[in-house]
Amino acid sequence: MPMSNAAAHPRYDALLAHWCELVRRCQEEPHTAPDPAPYGQDLLDRWAEPQRRYHSLDHIVAVLRRTTELTAYAVDPDAVALAAWFHDAVYRPDRSENEERSAQLAERALPEAGIGADRTAEVARLVRLTVSHDPDDGDRNGTVLCDADLAVLAGSPTDYAEYAAAVRKEYGFVPDEDFRAGRAAILRQLLALPRLFRTPYGHDEWEAVARRNMATELDLLEA
């Protein structure tokens, strides 16, 4: 049987191990709960779907790394990590309900995997929050997930250019003029936020660089 696209990724085994350890830690009855591995394999296969160029396995690796980096700010780091796994698990570039469908997937899969109702609800809430990336003051779990998801904006000029190019490839079916207008609107919306990054670390380390990167991209789009 040929290897799946996900299994060919160099971080596949590490990702699956991370998932299994995370779920076992969160299961209410770990001795009788299902094996987490099939759920993780399904998620990894989703993240490796061919329509993905930015929202890919590399993205989930990066977001999980950032949530670990910011873990001290979270009230429930495990809920944040689970939300990172699910936040774009359902992804179709031509649809607008990806976050909602991803949250619904979490609401189905996590109870089956032995995760309790309260934590499942928190994971789904966090996934839905990635629509706006605008958590309320005091939403510590939300700030960590949103900061981790937006950290790509603070990359080096080369890394940011690669990110922007990957986003464009995901929307390759959209005509240039329409893409430029839509992308510019998203950038303006993000730049209008009083703070992109709500954790102290994210604000201190990433805010200025991210705003500079986005402003540069916006200038190019509107040139």
Model-derived regions, located:
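Divalent metal-dependent phosphate-bond-processing catalytic cores, especially two-metal-ion Mg2+/Mn2+ enzymes
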Residues: 2-29, 48-55, 66-75, 86, ...
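An amphipathic alpha-helix signature
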Residues: 16-20, 37-41, 64, 79, ...
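Short alpha-helical hairpin
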Residues: 27-46, 59
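Acidic/histidine metal-binding catalytic segments
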Residues: 35-39, 75-82, 114-127
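Histidine- and acidic-residue-rich, metal-dependent catalytic cores
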Residues: 46, 102-136, 188
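His-Asp-centered metal-binding catalytic motifs of divalent-metal-dependent phosphohydrolases/nucleases
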Residues: 63, 77-93, 102, 127-131
